Regions:
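Glycine-rich, proline-tolerant flexible connector loops at the mouths of alpha/beta enzymes
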Residues: 1-15, 178-187
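Long, contiguous binding/interaction regions
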Residues: 15, 23-26
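Short hydrophobic/aromatic-enriched beta-strand-loop microsegments
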Residues: 50-58, 79, 106
Length: 211
């Protein structure tokens, strides 16, 4: 996919879908990838991808979201929608509604923070009140947190994961790489599988605590 600026690693295209199919075959895990165009949707459906997600820059463009929604008509597949890059709840809800109006029922939202010129602490400001309001507006919608994109630095992932759990998010999307420093994109926000396992085991999930 196109990066914020040209020149960075933008993926290998359709060839990568075959890799995901192999991962699914070897591990039995569901596989997921981002779609930004109707062509992406068609290729992913043809490859048997289990879950699709709409990226933050795409969510901010109703034209692109509608194109994706049209391509998904008549298809039953889970679709997750990231918040738009700008802090606009109506834009986020609008993207969810466009996909819902195409007949898809298995929808979820991903909170990955909002762009800001000031990046003193976070890569993307969490502005937790926005996903909290989304929960109030659409109570049954699963909402996941992406601490990797919010934090932008691996040392922030653990506390952001715990904060998301404290706010009753339904799950986490954390970037992991066997050798994070050698990752071709977003290396600073990735953790090894062992560190990810450690972070997850440390989480305190209040809904699971029996008093």
């Amino acid at each position: 996919k196109p990066r914020t600026k040209p020149g960075g690693f933008e993926g290998i295209g359709v060839e990568g879908l075959a890799w995901l199919k192999e991962v699914k075959k070897e591990t039995g895990m569901y596989v997921s990838t981002e779609v930004a165009t109707a062509k992406h949707v068609y290729e992913c459906l043809k490859a048997g991808i289990d879950i699709l997600w709409v990226g933050a820059r795409t969510t901010a463009n109703p034209f692109a979201v509608q194109e994706i929604a049209d391509a998904l008509k008549g298809v039953d597949i889970p679709v997750l929608v990231k918040n738009p890059v700008n802090p606009d709840l109506e834009l986020w809800i609008g993207a969810l509604e466009r996909i819902s109006n195409a007949g898809l029922k298995r929808l979820g939202a991903i909170h990955r923070g909002f762009s800001s010129y000031d990046k003193k602490i976070y890569r993307n400001l969490p502005q937790w009140h926005i996903p909290i309001e989304l929960r109030r507006r659409i109570p049954n919608l699963p909402i996941f947190c992406d601490p990797s994109h919010i934090g932008g630095k691996r040392e922030l992932i653990a506390p952001l994961c715990q904060q998301a759990m404290d706010l009753n998010f339904d799950g986490l999307i954390v970037e992991s790489h066997c050798n994070p420093d050698c990752a071709w994109s977003d290396a600073s926000q990735q953790v090894t599988p062992d560190v990810l396992d450690y972070i997850l085991n440390l989480l305190v999930i209040l809904s699971l605590i029996h008093i």
